[in-house]
Curated annotation (Swiss-Prot):
Short motif (SPKK motif 1): ranges: 4-7
Biased composition (Basic residues): 9-52
MF terms (GO), sorted A to Z: DNA binding; protein heterodimerization activity; structural constituent of chromatin
Organism, as annotated: Lytechinus pictus
Residue ranges of the motif SPKK motif 2: 9-12
Assembly and binders: The nucleosome is a histone octamer containing two molecules each of H2A, H2B, H3 and H4 assembled in one H3-H4 heterotetramer and two H2A-H2B heterodimers. The octamer wraps approximately 147 bp of DNA.
Family affiliation: Belongs to the histone H2B family.
Post-translational modification: Monoubiquitination of Lys-138 gives a specific tag for epigenetic transcriptional activation and is also prerequisite for histone H3 'Lys-4' and 'Lys-79' methylation. Phosphorylated on SPKK motifs 3, 4 and 5; which may regulate DNA binding. Dephosphorylated during maturation of spermatids to mature sperm and rephosphorylated at fertilization.
Cross-link (Glycyl lysine isopeptide (Lys-Gly) (interchain with G-Cter in ubiquitin)): 138
Function: Core component of nucleosome. Nucleosomes wrap and compact DNA into chromatin, limiting DNA accessibility to the cellular machineries which require DNA as a template. Histones thereby play a central role in transcription regulation, DNA repair, DNA replication and chromosomal stability. DNA accessibility is regulated via a complex set of post-translational modifications of histones, also called histone code, and nucleosome remodeling.
Residue interval(s) of motif SPKK motif 4: 19-22
Name the UniProt record assigns to this protein: Histone H2B.2, sperm
Amino acid sequence: MPRSPSKSSPRKGSPRKGSPRKGSPKRGGKGAKRAGKGGRRRNVVKRRRRRRESYGSYIYRVLKQVHPDTGISSRGMSVMNSFVNDVFERIAGEASRLCQANRRRTISSREIQTAVRLLLPGELAKHAVSEGTKAVTKYTTSR
């Protein structure tokens, strides 16, 4: 269905009124040569997609250690990722406040441990501290 020449074009520039029709010799058809630089392509810079960081692979690994025959949906993974981010931010914030209170500039494993004890309730804090200590020991011996 051809457009009527009276309608304005959505393109930028002059209105459609004075422009020639598709097949007219003024405009040139498919095989018409362009004026200027002969057939060179512009360097189009392809924008890289921003990487989305997540704890997904680590959550999946832990899931397979605990329940090897169980899967997780993408929605469930999103919830778990949000949960890990939230706990991480809470621990980091509390450790930061502890450093400020003790007039220190560096967050050490001691501040992290104290923050975990303050944030997590009872038995959960004890297990988290023992697992954290185990991980730090494993890391220092591997170096």
